[in-house]
């Protein structure tokens, strides 16, 4: 598939300024079409989907596809419509904003040589691993079927059925690589895997569990599924399904995965074996469990290795971002998801935390994140991204200002707490009732400190938790012995630091003139321009 490229100073496609160019634009999408209907029924679990739709009485179903599966989307929708007697709507990804959205159904169908036409084609607001409930609600959908890679974040608005697909994998080869990496059969190993290999984990467990009694294989347990038999779950680790009342094992749940650890042990006592290619899922696991030794097996290349990624170096980079966030005075809270449960709660918590720390905050909802969008707000010192765990870690090298996680922002604001190296990518862990939740008090240290970034003295004009929730019209009793301290507004400081501050007003020098009638019409044609 050919791709049109144009050399420009900014990464903006030339087609963005022409409607005809947008229609004719070809998208470089790595997608292949499944030729056999039988294979499509198996891979996309058509029968399971139909059973869920018919048993629950759903009439409108939204089908969410990533770029890599768009070639099969129309055929899958047709099969579901025919077998479940419902309306199927396609929610398609747009490559994280790198390509212009397709303006019409016919253009989309033409790209993939599809002859069937559906009533609606919507596009995702954020990353394709998250369930886009907003786009589905626009179509009045009653159920979302999410295909392909998924972050398994909890949703609340609509029921979600996950169909991960069945990427090919040689179980025998995988088990051989596992034995080569772990010759000691008594070692404690925790197995994670990409969701697209969930279909073969039962066979892998049967091949390895007799040899490795201390091996634990995680199970995919997404939340938000309609009530239906969880055929994706296997019977491995039976102790994990009956944990209540048992004291021998510890049941853990992270990132939509359940796993059970031995009694009197912690995650740091285990080595982790990951099945899948290099991905956001692997990076998220390595940052979260940074004290564990990771080994990976890639079914595509049939290669395994011990991961030598310097996690400490990555953590040092994140620590640098925390110091940048500590010095920030104006913070932008970027909403990176509208579908993950409790995203509004973490936004409100961040606003309160920033207010107590003496930082001014603004909330931005801008869809898929890119450099150009954030570059429009030069006044912001640092951005906080509220997103799913897999998309919360942003490499800020291309961005003009740092982009940090809610956990990093809280560490930066809480001066009395030192970072131990433990890392949290899931913002749910910061909410009340969770283990990482921090209780804010009014005795937080507000003394000046020396910035590790600039080497200068920094002041944070903190307010109490009570004041953070009050309006500026509240009355307080004045203390007659209080000394006066002045603070220059942050906006004035930023304006004073700019080399160009706007046109000179020349007060008293410019003559006052009578107001006259201006131009009428729109930019395409004003009334005084004629035909």
Curated annotation (Swiss-Prot):
Full protein name: 2-(3-amino-3-carboxypropyl)histidine synthase subunit 2
Pathway: Protein modification; peptidyl-diphthamide biosynthesis
Organism: Nematostella vectensis
UniProt function note: Required for the first step of diphthamide biosynthesis, a post-translational modification of histidine which occurs in elongation factor 2. Dph1 and dph2 transfer a 3-amino-3-carboxypropyl (ACP) group from S-adenosyl-L-methionine (SAM) to a histidine residue, the reaction is assisted by a reduction system comprising dph3 and a NADH-dependent reductase. Facilitates the reduction of the catalytic iron-sulfur cluster found in the dph1 subunit.
Subunit organization: Component of the 2-(3-amino-3-carboxypropyl)histidine synthase complex composed of dph1, dph2, dph3 and a NADH-dependent reductase.
Molecular-function annotations in GO: 2-(3-amino-3-carboxypropyl)histidine synthase activity; 4 iron, 4 sulfur cluster binding; metal ion binding
Assigned protein family: Belongs to the DPH1/DPH2 family. DPH2 subfamily.
Stretches for region Disordered: 222-243
Keyword Metal-binding annotated: yes
Upper classification of the organism: Eukaryota, Metazoa, Cnidaria, Anthozoa, Hexacorallia
Cofactor(s) of this protein: [4Fe-4S] cluster
Biased composition (Polar residues): 228-240
Cofactor comment text: Binds 1 [4Fe-4S] cluster per subunit. The cluster facilitates the reduction of the catalytic iron-sulfur cluster in the dph1 subunit.
GO cellular component, one term: 2-(3-amino-3-carboxypropyl)histidine synthase complex
Residues annotated as binding [4Fe-4S] cluster: 130, 151, 388
UniProt keyword annotations, A-Z: Iron, Iron-sulfur, Metal-binding
One of the GO biological process terms: protein histidyl modification to diphthamide
């Amino acid at each position: 598939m050919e791709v049109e490229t144009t050399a420009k100073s900014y990464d903006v496609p030339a087609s963005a300024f022409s409607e005809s160019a947008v229609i004719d634009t070809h998208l470089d999408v790595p997608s292949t079409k499944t030729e056999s209907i039988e294979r499509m029924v198996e891979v996309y679990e058509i029968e399971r989907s139909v059973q869920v739709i018919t048993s629950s009485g759903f009439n409108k179903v939204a089908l969410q596809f990533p770029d890599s599966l768009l070639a099969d989307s129309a055929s899958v929708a047709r099969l579901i419509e025919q077998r479940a007697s419902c309306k199927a709507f396609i929610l398609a990804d747009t490559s994280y904003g790198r390509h212009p959205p397709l303006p019409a159904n016919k253009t989309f169908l033409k790209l993939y040589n599809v002859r069937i036409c559906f009533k609606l084609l919507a596009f995702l607001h954020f990353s394709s691993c998250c369930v886009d409930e907003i786009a589905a609600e626009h179509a009045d959908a009653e159920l979302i079927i999410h295909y392909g890679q998924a972050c398994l974040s909890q949703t609340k608005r609509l029921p979600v059925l996950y169909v991960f697909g069945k990427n090919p994998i040689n179980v025998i080869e995988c088990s051989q690589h596992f034995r080569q990496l772990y010759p000691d059969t008594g070692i404690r190993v925790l197995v994670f895997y990409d969701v697209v290999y969930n279909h073969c984990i039962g066979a892998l467990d049967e091949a390895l569990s007799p040899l490795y009694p201390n091996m634990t294989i995680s199970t995919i347990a997404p939340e938000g599924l309609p009530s239906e038999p969880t055929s994706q779950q296997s019977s491995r680790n039976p102790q994990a399904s009956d944990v209540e009342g048992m004291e021998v094992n510890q049941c853990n749940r992270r990132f939509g995965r359940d796993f059970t650890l031995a009694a009197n042990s912690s995650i740091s006592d285990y080595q982790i074996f990951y099945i899948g290619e290099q991905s956001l899922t692997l990076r998220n696991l390595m940052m979260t469990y940074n004290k564990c030794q990771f080994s990976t097996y890639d079914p595509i290349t049939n290669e395994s290795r011990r991961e030598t990624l310097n996690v400490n170096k990555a953590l040092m980079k994140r620590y640098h971002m925390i110091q940048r966030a500590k010095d920030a005075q104006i913070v932008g809270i970027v909403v990176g998801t509208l579908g993950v449960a409790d995203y509004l709660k973490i936004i409100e918590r961040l606003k309160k935390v920033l207010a107590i720390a003496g930082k001014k905050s603004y909330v931005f909802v801008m869809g898929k994140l890119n450099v150009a969008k954030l570059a429009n707000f030069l006044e912001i010192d640092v951005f906080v991204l509220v997103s799913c765990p897999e998309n919360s870690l942003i490499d800020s090298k291309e961005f003009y200002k740092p982009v940090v996680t809610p956990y990093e922002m809280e560490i930066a604001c809480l001066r009395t707490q030192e970072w131990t190296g433990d890392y949290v990518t899931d913002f749910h862990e910061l909410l009340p009732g969770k283990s990482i939740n921090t209780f804010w008090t009014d005795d937080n240290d507000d003394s000046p400190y020396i910035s590790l970034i600039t080497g200068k003295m920094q002041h944070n004009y903190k307010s109490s938790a009570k004041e953070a929730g009050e309006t500026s019209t509240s009355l307080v009793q004045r203390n007659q012995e209080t000394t006066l301290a002045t603070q220059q507004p942050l906006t004035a400081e930023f304006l004073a630091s700019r080399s160009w501050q706007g046109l000179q007003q020349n007060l008293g020098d410019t003559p006052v003139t009578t107001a006259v009638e201006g131009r009428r019409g729109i930019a395409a044609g004003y009334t005084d321009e004629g035909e």
